[in-house]
Amino acid sequence: MDADVIVVGAGPVGLLLAAELRLAGARPLVLERLAEPGAEPKARGIGALATEALRRRGLGEALAAHQERGLADKARDHGSEKGHFAQIFKIDPALQEEPDRVGTLIWQPDLERVLAAHLTSLTGGSSAAVLRGHEVIALTQDDSGVTVTVGTPDGERRLSAPYLVGCDGGRSAVRKLAGFDFPGTEPTSVVRRVLTDAPGLDKLPESGWTGTGMLMRAPGMVATVEFDGFPEDRGLPLTAEEMRASLFRVTGVDVELPEVRGGLRFTDGARQAATYRVGRVLLAGDAAHVHSPNGGQGLNLGLMDAVNLGWKLAATVTGRAPEGLLDTYTAERHPVGAAVLHNTRAQSALLLPGAHVAAMRDIVSDLLDFLEVNRYFGRMLSGLGTRYELPYPATHPLAGRACPDLRLVTGTGGTRTLSELCGSGRPLLVHAPFQPEAAEAAQPWRGALDVAEVTVRDRDDLASALIRPDGTVAWASGPGPADTVTLTAALRAWLPPA
């Protein structure tokens, strides 16, 4: 075998998955079709959950370096730092239930550089874990592993591993070659976007609906939304001529575009793999689900796929997984992906032209002025409302949810954050000094988890918690006697057999 896990795709999802695998003791090998990393901006930011996940891996400073500039750019481009639902920019971060849990505005190429450096640091300074110019063209699997035929600049080669994960985007070769069902809905709109400083752009109207479509403008960028006229071959590059024609159809203004870059074309077609695992092949990110970019949820969704899968797959391939652990990947992440497809379809419907839809948009806009409605949409788009079903009774409000970056007081009186204790990538039990029974219950698993005796600040409802490697609260206790029966069930569910 050439690796423990072959990861196909060196975008943000593939790089983070490889890093999580390596941190948990597995040997990943990343295959990327492109010879060089993409330089053009695509996604513009990551959500609170992904931001917290990367902070737990020590990447907080790298993210913060991009955040201040990103906030300024967003305010400049949209006139507001608020989030949106179907381009209704009213979701106010300051009004949310947990206003300190925020995302990071970082362009995708910058994020890829951060993650590539992180992966390199985990592989002893070597970049050999990523093979560029390697395109998967055939795939077979049996009970022992997966073998791929790869096209390279030097000809074809065969590589094998016990498991393979497709992180190769919405047109995933892995998904097609492995035979995943990919049901969904056809597109109702197409977005075209280019980066350009063409002098004629000032002749265009301001951003908004034009009667025949939508126009979106920002310094150095212009985009259109049309509700018909899909290109016959969506795989062809977006040219200046196609963009010029689209601008004319949408605005009636003919703008010469002597030079464009960063051309993107995408639709609101929404599809999701029926399962995220077929035998020894798994999917993550856009390979598992595609949808419109409304709400900026796609990259966050994919990164959290990687965070959920990495430790589970590493435990499986290294023989440390409890029974059924890998099956929980689809069980937990598929409903989250389905929920994103659901809300992006709703946003697509609200963007359609016509008086009836315009009336509905006005009503949704009015509803967003109500605090609880604003928070509902904020939870939905951020993913902070996500709660996994746990295979044992767990009644604490945090159980099954992503743990916030708690502030903790140590025995010496110092203050630390939860993320500072999670760098090892192992499960973590934090317990109050007055709940030693929690640490005693975990004693048989001490070789497989980290334990810290701390006091949680600013939360009267939380004294102790078991945190999975992906940041999910597997068990939590309030200030009363710790429920060690449920804690033991949680340890058995997620950690190697004691």
Where are these regions (language model features)?
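Core beta-strand elements of the Rossmann-like FAD/NAD(P) dinucleotide-binding domain
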Residues: D2-A3, D154-Y163
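Conserved mid-domain beta->alpha element of the FAD-binding
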Residues: A10-A19, L31, L115, G166, ...
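Conserved FAD-binding catalytic core of PHBH/FMO-like flavoproteins
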Residues: A117, Y163, C167-D268
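Glycine-rich FAD pyrophosphate-binding loop
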Residues: E20-A43
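C-terminal helical "tail/cap" subdomain of flavin- and related membrane-associated enzymes
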Residues: A315-T410, R416-P427, A432-E437, P444, ...
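A conserved beta-strand/loop element that lines the FAD pocket in flavoprotein oxidoreductases
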Residues: L122-V136
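Active-site-adjacent segment of FAD-dependent monooxygenases/related oxidoreductases
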Residues: A39-H118
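A conserved short coil-to-beta-strand element within the FAD-binding core of flavoproteins
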Residues: R132-V146
